[in-house]
Structures are given as structure tokens and as C-alpha cells.
């Protein structure tokens, strides 16, 4: 009987990160109990994250439900991201940055027309997510507000005005989630200028378990 790889080699293979190229996106299944690490490998880069119930993609991540139960718009370690049916989807179990956004929708052609009329049009995170999620039965009209990892959107407490500032994430910073149900995940390396400090970089992710 031929022996298998040494345990240390197996561990390395299980935890190798996958890279999402700049201004693109992907989708994949995440089993209940599995750990998802979203990593900013170069710093100052946003990643839009969507989650859907793998058994019924009509149940999706919900910013409104999450804010209601968390009683804060600044979500970090210990907070849970809830579904449109008030069920836990993802728990944040570690967070190097502590500043993310769950207010703004994925950027799109219309975002670029509105905010960047002098820049080339790009389908943005919305288009990238729509293409990646289509094989799982998710249509464009089913795409909700994303949890924008590393996005820095301060809110003026007096006026309610939003600002989009460069992320405070540094190279190698990550946010780590545990899946509370079987999920379909959509994930991007964001395409919008203001969200990423004016440049576009990749995002890494790693699944453990």
C-alpha cells in the first residue's frame, strides 16, 4: 500500500488561497460549518460578498435584517450576517480591519454612468456577480445589497451623508466567516474607482473545512 502525502502537505493543499483577478468575480458553494477567509493581498481593495441558501437561492443575505439585529452598521468579529428570512448565514469570527460596508449596492454600468462619466464604462461587481451566480439559478433581479469587505463608508451622524473613502486594509489583512448553512457565495475584486483608492487589485480567498 502506497502511503499518502504527509499531513503537513495535506494541510498546505487544503488552505491554499485562490486569487480573484482585479475587476472580476467568482461564485462557489460553501458548506455549513466551513470557514471562508477573504484576504486583501495588496491592501486598499474592496471585495463584494453575496450569500444565498444553497437549497433555495430565493433566500439571500440581507443588510436590513442584519442591521436590525446587530443594532449597528459597523459589523465586525462576533456579528452575524442574516438572511432575508431572518436566519443566520455567516458569522464573522475574525477581522483584521474592523471597517466594512453593508449599505451600498454592487457597482454596475449605471454606477459608472452616474459617478464616473469621464471613465470607460465597466459592468462592475454587479455584472461580474450576475455572470458568476447565473449557473446557480441566481438572476440579476435576485442580487441584493452586498457585504462589501474592507469598504470604508463613514456616515455623518448629524446629516446622514455618506462618504466613500479608501479602505484602511493593509496587505494581507483578512476577514473570516463561518457558514451557518449550506451557501452559494458570490465574491469579487471590486471595480469602482473611489472604493479602492483609485486603483484595482486582486482579492484572495481561502476555504477551510
Which stretches of residues belong to each language-model region?
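Acidic, Ser/Thr/Pro
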Residues: 4-209
Amino acid at each position: 500500500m502506497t502511503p499518502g502525502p504527509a499531513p503537513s502537505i495535506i494541510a498546505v493543499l487544503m488552505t491554499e488561497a485562490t486569487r480573484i483577478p482585479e475587476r472580476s468575480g467568482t461564485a462557489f458553494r460553501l458548506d455549513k460549518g466551513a470557514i471562508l477567509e477573504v484576504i486583501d493581498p495588496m491592501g486598499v481593495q474592496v471585495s463584494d460578498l453575496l450569500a444565498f441558501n444553497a437549497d433555495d437561492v430565493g433566500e439571500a443575505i440581507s443588510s436590513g435584517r442584519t442591521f436590525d439585529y446587530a443594532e449597528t452598521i459597523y459589523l465586525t468579529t462576533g456579528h452575524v450576517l442574516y438572511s432575508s428570512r431572518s436566519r443566520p448565514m455567516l458569522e464573522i469570527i475574525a477581522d483584521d480591519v474592523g471597517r466594512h460596508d453593508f449599505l451600498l449596492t454592487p457597482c454596475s454600468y449605471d454606477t459608472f454612468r452616474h459617478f464616473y462619466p469621464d471613465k470607460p464604462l465597466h459592468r462592475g461587481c454587479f455584472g461580474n456577480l450576475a455572470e458568476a451566480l447565473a449557473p446557480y439559478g441566481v438572476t440579476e433581479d435576485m442580487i441584493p445589497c452586498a457585504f462589501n469587505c474592507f469598504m470604508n463608508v463613514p456616515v455623518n451622524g448629524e446629516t446622514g451623508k455618506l462618504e466613500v473613502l479608501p479602505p484602511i486594509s493593509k496587505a494581507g489583512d483578512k476577514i473570516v466567516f463561518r457558514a451557518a448553512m449550506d451557501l452559494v457565495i458570490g465574491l469579487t475584486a471590486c471595480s469602482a474607482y473611489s472604493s479602492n483608492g483609485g486603483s484595482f487589485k486582486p482579492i484572495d480567498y481561502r476555504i477551510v473545512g
